[in-house]
Amino acid sequence: MADAGARRPFFRRRKTCPFTGANAPKIDYKDSKLLMRYISERGKIVPSRITAVSAKKQRELARAVKRARFLGLLPYVIR
C-alpha cells in the first residue's frame, strides 16, 4: 500500500487555447476589448505560456495588436 506521506506530485492540467473550438472568438484588430485581455498593465503583449494561446494564434494575436496600435485603437505604452 502507498504510504500516507508519499503522494504523487500535483499535476497541473494544460489549459486549452481560447481561440480554438466551436464558438471561439475571431481575432480581429478592430476588437480592442478582446485584445486588451492579452496586453499587460504596462502595454506589452502577454506571452502564450501565460495565456495558453497556441503558437499560430499567438502570432495572429500579436499581428492584430500591432495593427491596432498603429491605427491608434490601442496604446503602445500604458502609464
Curated annotation (Swiss-Prot):
Pfam families: Ribosomal_S18
Annotated InterPro entries: Ribosomal_bS18, Ribosomal_bS18_CS, Ribosomal_bS18_sf
GO molecular function: small ribosomal subunit rRNA binding; structural constituent of ribosome
A GO cellular component entry from the record: cytosolic small ribosomal subunit
Keywords: Ribonucleoprotein, Ribosomal protein, RNA-binding, rRNA-binding
Task performed by this protein: Binds as a heterodimer with protein bS6 to the central domain of the 16S rRNA, where it helps stabilize the platform of the 30S subunit.
Subunit structure: Part of the 30S ribosomal subunit. Forms a tight heterodimer with protein bS6.
Protein's name according to its UniProt entry: Small ribosomal subunit protein bS18
Gene: rpsR
